[in-house]
Amino acid sequence: MRDRVRWRVLSLPPLAQWREVMAALEVGPEAALAYWHRGFRRKEDLDPPLALLPLKGLREAAALLEEALRQGKRIRVHGDYDADGLTGTAILVRGLAALGADVHPFIPHRLEEGYGVLMERVPEHLEASDLFLTVDCGITNHAELRELLENGVEVIVTDHHTPGKTPPPGLVVHPALTPDLKEKPTGAGVAFLLLWALHERLGLPPPLEYADLAAVGTIADVAPLWGWNRALVKEGLARIPASSWVGLRLLAEAVGYTGKAVEVAFRIAPRINAASRLGEAEKALRLLLTDDAAEAQALVGELHRLNARRQTLEEAMLRKLLPQADPEAKAIVLLDPEGHPGVMGIVASRILEATLRPVFLVAQGKGTVRSLAPISAVEALRSAEDLLLRYGGHKEAAGFAMDEALFPAFKARVEAYAARFPDPVREVALLDLLPEPGLLPQVFRELALLEPYGEGNPEPLFLLFGAPEEARRLGEGRHLAFRLKGVRVLAWKQGDLALPPEVEVAGLLSENAWNGHLAYEVQAVDLRKPEALEGGIAPFAYPLPLLEALARARLGEGVYVPEDNPEGLDYAWKAGFRLLPPEEAGLWLGLPPRPVLGRRVEVALGREARARLSAPPVLHTPEARLKALVHRRLLFAYERRHPGLFSEALLAYWEVNRVQEPAGSP
């Protein structure tokens, strides 16, 4: 599997843009590099406005809800059972009730009924509602919704799961059906927008008090945290400690919430989901809907208990299935007739993480998929839809139901689908080399402005390398700690790892407060022996001395020169080099090569230049730090023979130094 894990160093920005970000955001070059790669160019980009999105059908749905309010119609809110669906359901049930609606929730039983609107439940829905409103589901329930409409029940579908070729009957509000919409709200996000549109129609202020519920759903569903989602999550995270909803407030207090998205992802959302996974989603929904503090406190305790049981079931299922997973198979398709359907999604994720293969699990007639590019989970299911009772989901995750007697045919079908694609690869994207220890406090503070971290806005990873020192085990041998170049590295759940003489670490910069002192450490995300490192702006650079490279070029070896290197192109044309595209060239000229014997060549070849680049830099100004960062990357790429990085770093070096060649150089 390690051959499908690729480390890549992110490219350096054009110098003018890099400096503009440094100036606009008042940060050093290290943080500016991270901001630039996320599209943050100005302070306003870090705080996008939270506005009403122009979703297709949104205003029509709000008008239908207003009519239902005025006529006293019974509204049934049919939500999904996961954290996104439950928070979205709570938003609309609470929000509509506050406006005087006759509204009640309905959540299907995860284990007995599964995902979506069931035909067997349609008679009950007909009896209980005049308006049927879905949250985080419904986009694939054509027959069920048509039955409701034909029997006089109005239907509004709010969803964000991958739609089919045609939308279902009824009034549909779905981000994917809005042309040119870049934003990706989740089920809870769409529910929040619908309530907002209704408030606007009624002349009321935006219902921002519901942003905390929507933020929990957005984070739980691993939505990209940029643009509108970023604005929503920032607003919601700030509101959680003093939430208007006592259940959410007490749950946050119980798990030690301090305002970070990661705490929602790994503490709050799993407890909400645990109730659903074990068939008791109504307890999580009651927690989000109750206004009674005593009831809320008891329900928080129940969610803790359910989460502990979920962890036990998960570990047992993983121990059973992981040995059956063949990491060489194009897809891992496993049946566990006695397995617990409620935890198989997490188990599938952990098997995917261990094998880097798409995983399809079936337990008691229920199924789950976890996948990674280039294989789409929902498209894989679509290739076998004639074998399924129902299905739905996204590229990365999906769910389905099936007759287990058809499992062999299903397995063959999805394996054939997966075989059409190249092997998935996990990329470890590294921002840069870890800065000098003296800069870590400032870099940490400046990077904190990137929060909330999450999908689409990952916490920056740094590269740290060298000979590990002072290695020791922690936590009864479960974890590993050691030092690299004076920086403490913590590798969680890696206690059995035998460190090589030299190691490369991809890690997160963290701040550790202890006894009144602050220390800056690296939390290892991945470790390995020194290997190839991808990155840079070209696939070829100087794997040999420049003079030798030029001599080989004169003998006819193919050369690539970037179009934005006119001096190099002119030199190559005059020298008669055979110019080729980068993927075909054996040599890549990453710097203007004239004059061959000038100071420029020293950077590539000379001992004097290497000593100059490795000398301790003077870091009094942001510009000095910018030069030091470029020098450090250049020296690293050259000495460790990473051609792509070296070619890019050479261009950056010339740009930040603007070296003047000696007069009279050839």
Swiss-Prot record:
Stretch forming the signal peptide: none
Keyword DNA-binding: yes
Annotated residues for binding of Mn(2+) 1: D80, D82, D136
E.C. no: 3.1.-.-
A Pfam family of this chain: RecJ_C
The protein's enzyme class: hydrolase
GO MF term list: DNA binding; exonuclease activity; metal ion binding
Transmembrane intervals: none
Keywords: DNA-binding, Exonuclease, Hydrolase, Manganese, Metal-binding, Nuclease
Free-text comment on the cofactor: Requires a divalent cation; Mg(2+) > Mn(2+) > Co(2+). Structures with 1 Mg(2+), or 1 or 2 Mn(2+) were determined; the authors conclude 2 metal ions are required for activity.
Binding site for Mn(2+) 2: D84, D136, H160, D221
UniProt xrefs under InterPro entries: DDH_dom, DHH_sf, DHHA1_dom, RecJ_C_thermales, RecJ_OB, SSDNA_exonuclease_RecJ
Cofactor(s), by name: Mg(2+); Mn(2+); Co(2+)
Family named by the database record: Belongs to the RecJ family.
Subunit structure and binding partners: Monomer. Intact protein binds ss- but not dsDNA.
Function text: Single-stranded-DNA-specific exonuclease acting in a 5' to 3' direction; has no detectable activity on ssRNA.
PANTHER family: SINGLE-STRANDED-DNA-SPECIFIC EXONUCLEASE RECJ
Record-given protein name: Single-stranded-DNA-specific exonuclease RecJ
Gene giving rise to this polypeptide: recJ
